[in-house]
Structure formats: C-alpha cells, structure tokens
C-alpha cells in the first residue's frame, strides 16, 4: 500500500490487516515513506488503538529485519513495557539474576532508559557488563552462564529509521508496545510487566498467536493512582497467564506468597550507579526488605513460567534459596566476568 492509501484508511478510522501493517512497517523501516507521513501514521494508529493483527504485523516486519541469535528455546525473558514513571529500581534485572542463580536460563531483551532514569542496559553497564557484545559472543556467554542480554539497538538496527521521528513526536506509539514481544532469540516463555492494563488483552492474544508456551502478563497496583509494569509488593497485581493455549486471569496480593506490603517509595531507585548498588545489595542480602521482596516476587514468577517450578509458591522457594545460598550473587559475578572476558576477546580479534 502507498503512504496515502494507509493514511486515508486510518483517517477514516479503519483497522489495517496483518499483511497491510507488515507492509506499512516495512516501508517505514526502509525509509520509503516521508518523515511527515510516518509521523502521521504513527499518531493515527495511536489515536485509533492498535489491534492484535496490527501488532503482529508490525512485529513480523521488525523481527524479519533483526540480527539473529540462537539460544536455548527454554530461556525466559523478564521485561516490562516501561512508562509507569514510578521511579523504582530495576526490579526485573535483579529478578533475572536471582532466577538465573536458581538455574533458570535467561535471555533478557532490553534497552537504555526511555521513560525512566535507568534502563536495563544502563544498570548492566554500571555493573560492568558490556551490553554491545556481538551476537556470536553472546551465544557463547549464554552457553557458559545461562544468561544473555540482548541489547535492542544491536539486534534491531532497522529501528534507527524511526528513532528521530519518535523523539520528535514525543508521544507513545505502537513501537512502545513492541519491545517485550520482539525478543530476537524468539523466546516462548516470558514475564512481561505492563504499565497500561488496557493493552493486556492485546498482548495476550498476540503472544498466543505467536506460539507462546508459558507467559505471565502483570500489572501492579501501588496503592494509589499509579500503576507498575511489575508484580507489586505495594498492592494487588492483576495477572493474565498464558499456558498451553489457555488464558487464565488472576489477582494476587504480596501476602499470598509470604511477602510484605510496602509503600512505593521504599522501592525508589536512582541513576544507573545507584540502581547497580541496589542490585548488589539485594543479591548479598543487605538491601532493605522491601526491595528484596520486590525482586523475589518477579523472580518467583520467572521460575514458574520457566517450567522449573510448578507454581509461584515453588518459584518463591527457589528464588529465596538462590539468594540465601549466594547462588544469585555468584551467578551475577560469573556473568559479568565472562562477559568482560568475551568482550576483550572480541576487541583483540578486531585489532
């Protein structure tokens, strides 16, 4: 479809089919549309609200242009949509280390900060992890440690085509929805934190159509008007579980899993160096209990969707064991040490 045809269809309030959206996104990624046209398309899609077919079409386009990486298909991604503006520390990154210490393979897809002070890539760098490790070295890191961080700009170079337009628009677009569902390793097991509960059903349908094996979509309450793209230790958490082709809805409280109920302010983070120190303190057991509980909750769900735990309670036991035995701390140190060694090896090979 030509740019004008897509614009006219969206102006009239019509949805695009999966194929139309994939074709449209291909044109955007390949700079075949004008900047003004691309901006208008993104704004109109946002005003209308993206359908599952449109999201799947956009995903198909971006994934087809992504840099491939081969990891264990049982690996789990822990990520969130961002956008909650609560200023919490990097809960899902801390949880990834705890779960990995419990023997769960992790393939975390992430980026630098967009809506927060500190994205997953930022905090990993502050911990000493080189996020731009080439895919072949990342595969080796995963084989040695069971952990890989997939830095979005490295694996999705086509996204650069819209970076300036997105920044100039200054509004949420369909691209804000795509991060959690375009993991370049093609993971089938995920914990996805969703800031906007109105899009949870869209994510659920997209994940099922994309062949998800076991995933949990979570939206946490903070006890006030703010929401979290994390499971919450501040109030109830709404969950949509996707397992064996079924959609199951839950609402849970932190007390259901032996966790405390905390004020959102007790989960506050800061810049990348502050958040890196928080993660170290969680893993060595010296952090305030509120922060430990938040990381344990996300790790417990990660263990559950991995298949290693039969329920979240069992995932909690595995996660607590990972902390208490220092397996999580040892695993993080091993991951960073191995990452640095492989990065140095790659640098030496190019000199």
UniProtKB/Swiss-Prot annotation:
The keyword Ligase does not apply. This is Anthranilate phosphoribosyltransferase. It catalyses: N-(5-phospho-beta-D-ribosyl)anthranilate + diphosphate = 5-phospho-alpha-D-ribose 1-diphosphate + anthranilate. Its cofactor is Mg(2+). One of its GO terms (cellular component) is cytosol. One of its GO terms (biological process) is L-tryptophan biosynthetic process. Keywords: Amino-acid biosynthesis, Aromatic amino acid biosynthesis, Glycosyltransferase, Magnesium, Metal-binding, Transferase, Tryptophan biosynthesis.
């Amino acid at each position: 479809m030509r740019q004008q045809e897509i614009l006219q269809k969206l102006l009239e309030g019509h949805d695009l089919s999966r194929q139309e959206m994939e074709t449209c996104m291909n044109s955007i990624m390949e700079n075949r549309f004008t900047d003004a046209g691309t901006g208008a398309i993104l704004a109109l899609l946002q005003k209308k609200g993206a359908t599952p077919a449109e999201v799947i079409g956009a995903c198909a386009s971006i994934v087809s242009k992504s840099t491939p990486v081969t990891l264990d298909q049982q690996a789990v991604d822990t990520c969130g949509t961002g956008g909650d503006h609560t200023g919490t520390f990097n809960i899902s990154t801390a949880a990834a280390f705890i779960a990995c210490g419990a023997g769960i393979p992790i393939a975390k897809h992430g980026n630098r900060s967009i809506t927060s002070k500190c994205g997953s890539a930022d905090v990993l760098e502050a911990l000493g992890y080189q996020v731009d490790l080439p895919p072949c070295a990342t595969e080796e890191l995963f084989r040695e440690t069971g952990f890989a961080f997939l830095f979005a700009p490295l694996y999705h170079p086509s996204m650069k085509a819209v970076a300036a337009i997105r920044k100039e628009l200054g509004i949420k677009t369909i691209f804000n929805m795509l991060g959690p569902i375009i993991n370049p390793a093609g993971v089938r097991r995920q914990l996805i934190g969703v800031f906007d509960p109105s899009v949870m059903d869209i994510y659920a349908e997209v994940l099922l159509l994309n062949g998800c094996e076991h995933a949990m979509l979570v939206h946490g309450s903070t006890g006030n008007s703010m929401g979290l793209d994390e499971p919450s230790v501040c109030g109830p958490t709404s969950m949509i579980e996707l397992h064996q082709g079924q959609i199951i809805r839950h609402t849970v409280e932190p007390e259901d899993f032996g966790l405390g109920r905390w004020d959102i302010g007790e989960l506050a983070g800061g810049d990348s160096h502050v958040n890196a120190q928080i993660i170290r303190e969680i893993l060595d057991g010296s952090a305030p209990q509120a922060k430990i509980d938040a990381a344990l909750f996300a790790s417990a769900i990660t263990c559950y969707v991995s298949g290693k735990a039969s329920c979240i309670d069992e995932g909690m036991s595995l996660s607590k064991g990972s902390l208490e035995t220092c397996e999580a701390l040892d695993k993080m140190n091993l991951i960073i040490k191995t990452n640095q060694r492989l990065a140095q090896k790659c640098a030496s090979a190019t000199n």
